Every structure is written in structure tokens, then in C-alpha cells.
């Protein structure tokens, strides 16, 4: 059963497009297209895992261009009875970065008693199309004090991103248009009901320890714990359907009966 069943991704929560950008043809605006990715899914089987996640699934990229990860919506569901103890910390990671504190883009903590949760991350930075084809993002998951036999799946996570795809940097930059970003370090959101152990160790330290134990390339195999359909992002050579210079593609997202929060980063 898909976790993401209804509602819509609200692009305006992440991007503030001017009226001029909506009217002008794409050749006169730095925005080539604004779109939402398809849903990528991770089934968590281990208490601590570092998994590949395709945040640009279904996004049409431009050859020799750029893609800005403007926003990310993460939905999680516990596959557990209501009275279970313990909790989880989820962290978005840029695997290109060598320093663990710079690799962590946003962290979120919640208890197993929350059957369903949802949070938003605002990475707000661009990478080249060439880097994007290498799937540079990972998810670090740390489950604590959830007593389940090995081989079963206590937690499911789904990811949908809002992206801006464009060809050149020479025109006025896009990043000052991104909303919900403020100065300061990455924010880590914590539910009051989460056990104290969740707040003791920052996720950047957990990532550094995990990398030192397993090696940076030792991540969860895609075929075992993540979705089977992990195709590379598609390249777009200029034939996307535009609406006044922008293309909009939306996925459905759950938006009722769930716990929703925002995690922010200071990347500019």
C-alpha cells in the first residue's frame, strides 16, 4: 500500500515565483522548469542503515545544466502496533561531502508511537546534471529501542522532492527566490515524546561513526531494502511542455491525519 495517497505537493511552500517568471518564455527566464519528482521508497530492515535514495526520480534533466533541490517532503509510517516504544532519527545526507557535519542536510526525530509522520527539508542548493546522474543523496536511519525480530520491516519511508531544472547560471540566480530558509546551522527537530537517547548524539556524529565503521561506499543495496524501480533521472534536451516558461509536474502527498514539520538547512 502506498503511503502517499492524496493531497498535493504545494510548490509555493518552497519556491516564490514572480509573475514575470510565470509569463515569460523559458528563453527569457532563468527557470527552465519546476517539477516534483516521482515517489522513491525505502523499506527499513536494520536498526542503523545508510541507504541510497533517488530524489530526482522521474525528473527530466538538461544536458550540461543544473538542478536545484528546492525542497523535500518525507513521509514515514511505522509498521508496528500502536503501543510500541522506541523511536527513529532520519537524516538526509549528501554523500559527496567528506566532513560529516557538512554532509548532513537535515535531521528529524520521532517516536514509534507516532504511526505516521511527515516532515519537510529545504536543502536549497544546486548540483550539475552530471553529478545528479550519480544519485548523490543518501538517507541515514537510526532506530533505537524497537524490539522486532531480524528480517522484518518496522518502518517505511517515502520521498518526493521539488526541483528547479535550468541550463545556465549566467542570469539572475534562483536561490534568492527560495522561501523558508534562514541563517544559522541545520535544524534538528525533536518530538517531546522521544526518548532522551535520541537527543544525546547529533546526526552528524552518527554519520561520521557509521562511515568509519563501514566505509563510505558501504550502503544498503538497492535491491534489498529500497525500491526496485531506481532508474536514473531522465535527461531533457529542451522538449518539455512549458506553461509560460515553466513546467509543473506534481505528485500526490498525504496531508491529513499525519504529523508534519519542517527541517531546514543553511546551504546557499
Swiss-Prot record:
Keyword match Nucleotide-binding: no
Pfam families in the cross-refs: MP (PF01107)
Major localization class: host cell
GO annotation, biological process: transport of virus in host, cell to cell
GO CC annotation: host cell cytoplasm; host cell plasmodesma; host cytoskeleton
Biased composition (Polar residues): 259-268
Keyword hit for Calcium: no
Top-rank lineage group of the source organism: Viruses
GO molecular function per UniProt: double-stranded DNA binding; RNA binding
InterPro entries membership: TMV_movement, Viral_movement
Keywords in alphabetical order: Host cell junction, Host cytoplasm, Host cytoskeleton, Host-virus interaction, RNA-binding, Transport, Viral movement protein
Location within or outside the cell: Host cytoplasm, Host cytoskeleton; Host cell junction, Host plasmodesma
Region entry Disordered, spans: 217-268
Membership in a protein family: Belongs to the tobamovirus movement protein family.
Quaternary structure note: Binds to host RBCS at the plasmodesmata; this interaction seems required for viral systemic movement. In resistant plants, interacts with host MBP2C at host microtubules; this interaction prevents virus cell to cell movement. In resistant plants, interacts with host resistance (R) protein (e.g. tomato ToMV resistance protein TM-2(2), AC Q71BG9) at the host plasma membrane; this interaction triggers host defense responses leading to programmed cell death.
Function text: Transports viral genome to neighboring plant cells directly through plasmosdesmata, without any budding. The movement protein allows efficient cell to cell propagation, by bypassing the host cell wall barrier. Forms a ribonucleoprotein complex with viral RNA. Binds microtubules and modulates microtubule stability. Can bind double-stranded DNA. Triggers host hypersensitive defense reaction in incompatible plants harboring resistance (R) proteins.
Protein name: Movement protein
Species for this entry: Tobacco mosaic virus (strain Rakkyo)
